[in-house]
Amino acid sequence: MRTLIILFFLTNTIVMAQENISSELPFKSIPEDATNYAAGNLLVRMIEGAGYRFYWATEGLTSDDLKYKPSDSGQSVWETVEHIYGLSDIIRNTSMNKVSIRPPADTPTDWAALRMKTLRYLEDATKQLRNKSPEELAALEIIFERGGKQSTFPLWNMINGPISDIMYHSGQIVSFRRTNGNPLPKGVNVFTGRTKE
């Protein structure tokens, strides 16, 4: 009996800790508007929009949702989130003018850590890019390294590449979870970046 009580207490503690982590994650809502339309701030808002969509697409997913895939040959929700993590890694590294090693070596294998790290990487990028001038942005490049070989691309590719791709795949997750019987939480408004609770 004592073991059951301890187990119950530990389980409740873990669940409460996960809820606290979730409430502290970035992009539950889009931050207040920037005070100017600096080039960096426009890029930041695009990343914030992607982060908001990802936050709510993945909020409240069950282990059954994470395994869901629309067909035998398709990717599961878990695999899609791993891909989004890789995209967030590219965005973060580019914002710091660092090399993005492909494939990323440190992809978390725990759901809470994978989601948290993805959102934190996007948040890190917004902090780096905020208020950057066009000249400062022009100095940034997407740098990939695979098998010891590097390739570079202009920052423009981050808009139609990783940022847009996160939005696209977040939409897939929303569709998959709805098909699996767990629709997006009510009140999510991607236009305002706020969620009515």
Regions found by a protein language model. Name each.
Residues 60-66, 128-138, 178-184:
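Surface-exposed helix-capping loop/turn segments at secondary-structure junctions
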Residues 60, 83-86, 120:
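Residues within well-ordered alpha-helical secondary structure of globular protein domains
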Residues 19-25, 32, 44-48, 55, ...:
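Short, contiguous alpha-helical
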Residues 38-39:
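Membrane-proximal N-terminal soluble sensing/regulatory segments of transmembrane proteins
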Residues 53-56, 60, 124, 128, ...:
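Solvent-exposed, charged/polar functional surfaces in cytosolic regulatory/catalytic domains
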Residues 109-146, 151-168:
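Acidic/histidine-rich alpha-helical segments that form the ligand environment
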Residues 1-22:
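Bacterial Sec-dependent N-terminal signal peptides
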